[in-house]
Every structure is written in structure tokens, then in C-alpha cells.
Curated annotation (Swiss-Prot):
Keywords: Plasmid
Keyword Nucleotide-binding: no
Protein name stated in the entry: Uncharacterized protein y4oW
Domain Cupin type-2: residue ranges: 125-176
Transmembrane regions listed in the UniProt entry: none
Lineage, uppermost ranks: Bacteria, Pseudomonadati, Pseudomonadota, Alphaproteobacteria, Hyphomicrobiales
Domain of life, source organism: Bacteria
Length: 216
């Protein structure tokens, strides 16, 4: 049985996320030179490479992917296997029920930094990074791959570490305000809603956020 997340906004692989989440689970998979089956286990599934390069094989053929690239795993094209060739690689598999119009997906890195003027919205909390406070016209999920720091979502802040997934509801401002050790993370912006704008949005440029208050 999957356990309930201890915090509404942060969950880990195998936890039960909040009911509003389109991301229902995630899993890290380490790859070697031996082909490894990647089972289809959800309505929607996406494989994101988080380190190295790998080759994903399916009924459609083979696709080589490098860090930051992803592949949507359509059940009609299964079964799927993946290997890292002569090297090593890690992939992150997202499971869920998102739609067809999506935001961005990839890998980000952030270290301790002296704040510099950024295009984000103004903040009133301690901040030591040049990451910008912003919102989206979709939900977003951050999975911490390396490092630790402080994430701010709306009026709440959370300490995050390796293996944490931060679920960020549509319209809620969010920020990676402090980093205790260099952070590497994966991000996935799921179904676009409302005005369906993509990318980082700021109230001083794009107008008031379309906040979904129940998504906390």
C-alpha cells in the first residue's frame, strides 16, 4: 500500500500525492549496457534522461536521448527497453494522467549565488539565489536529483532534498530561494490551462496569476 505524503506539497516515489496532481508517481532507473525493460504502468508515461545518454527501444524503433531530453511512452508502441550503451545513465520515469497540451520538461541546475536583479516578481523572504519568483498556466513538478535547499510555494516554504517531488499548483508563485548544496533537479510542467501561456510568467509583465487555490 502506498503511504500518504507527510506534507501536502512534497511527496516521494511511492507516496500518495495530493488528489489534484496529474503526476501520480515517479521512479528513478539506473541504466547500464544491458537492456532493461521499462514497464508501462500508467495512463500517461514520460521518460526523462537525468544523466548520461541512453537508447530507448520500442516497436517504433530506437531513439538515443541525452541528459535533459525526454520520450513519451505510448502504450501502442510498447514494449520498451532502455540501455546506456558502453556508459552509465539515469532516467526518471513520470507516471500520471496529464493532457495533450503541455508546458516544458527538462533538467535544471542551481548553486549558491549572490542575488542579482532578475525579471521575477518581488519577494519578501530570505533569498540567496538568482532564481526568479514566477507562476505558470499549468501545474509543475520539481524532482530533486542532487543537493538540498529551500523551495517557496505561495506563502509556504519547504526544505527539500534528494528524492523529494514538489507539486506546484497552477498560478501559485514558486521559487528556489536558498541552496545549501548545488541542486540538480527535473521539472515537468503538465497540462496547460486558462490562457495556456508557457514559460515563466510574472505579474509585473503578464498580469495577475490565475491561481487554483485548491491545488496546495
Amino acid at each position: 500500500m502506498r503511504r500518504e505524503s507527510k506534507q501536502m506539497t512534497i511527496f516521494r516515489s511511492g507516496d500518495q500525492p495530493p488528489g489534484w496532481c496529474e503526476l501520480t508517481d515517479f521512479e528513478f532507473v539506473d541504466l547500464t549496457d544491458q537492456p532493461l525493460p521499462i514497464p508501462l504502468a500508467a495512463e500517461k508515461q514520460r521518460l526523462l534522461v537525468t544523466s548520461g545518454s541512453c537508447c530507448v527501444r520500442s516497436a517504433e524503433g530506437a531513439q538515443v536521448l541525452s541528459e535533459g531530453q525526454f520520450l513519451d511512452m505510448d502504450g501502442a508502441n510498447g514494449p520498451f527497453t532502455a540501455d546506456a550503451g558502453e556508459g552509465a545513465a539515469q532516467v526518471l520515469v513520470f507516471y500520471g494522467r496529464w493532457g495533450n497540451e503541455l508546458g516544458g520538461c527538462g533538467v535544471f541546475k542551481l548553486g549558491p549565488d549572490t542575488p542579482v536583479p532578475v525579471r521575477g516578481d518581488p519577494v519578501n523572504y530570505p533569498k540567496s539565489t538568482n532564481f526568479d519568483s514566477h507562476y505558470h498556466d499549468c501545474d509543475e513538478y520539481w524532482v530533486i536529483i542532487e543537493g538540498a535547499g529551500t523551495v517557496v510555494v505561495g506563502s509556504r516554504s519547504f526544505e527539500v532534498e534528494v528524492g523529494d517531488c514538489v507539486a506546484i499548483g497552477m498560478g501559485h508563485h514558486h521559487d528556489l530561494s536558498e541552496v545549501w548544496s548545488d541542486v540538480k533537479g527535473a521539472y515537468f510542467e503538465t497540462t496547460l490551462e486558462g490562457r495556456k501561456r508557457f514559460g515563466h510568467l510574472w505579474e509585473h509583465t503578464h498580469g495577475p496569476a490565475d491561481v487554483r487555490p485548491e491545488r496546495v
